[in-house]
């Protein structure tokens, strides 16, 4: 992959999720951060490890699509 991909989902002007995709130890890793309303501490499920970058990208795309269906803006 050779770099990192960061995407953020917002709703009503507030960040609700952030996904970071990068290479590490011969795999592609996706870290997720979910920011709950009223909480100072984000949830950090994962990390999610994939043997190929296309699999990791697909995971990120599907997660972002689900967030869009829920009314979030993705950037």
Regions found by a protein language model. Name each.
Residues 1, 74-75:
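Short intrinsically disordered terminal tails
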Residues 9-25:
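Amphipathic, interaction-prone secondary-structure segments
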Residues 17-19, 30-32, 50, 60:
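Hydrophobic beta-strand residues in large extracellular and virion-surface proteins
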Residues 41-58:
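A short, exposed loop/beta-hairpin motif centered on an aromatic-Gly-Thr core
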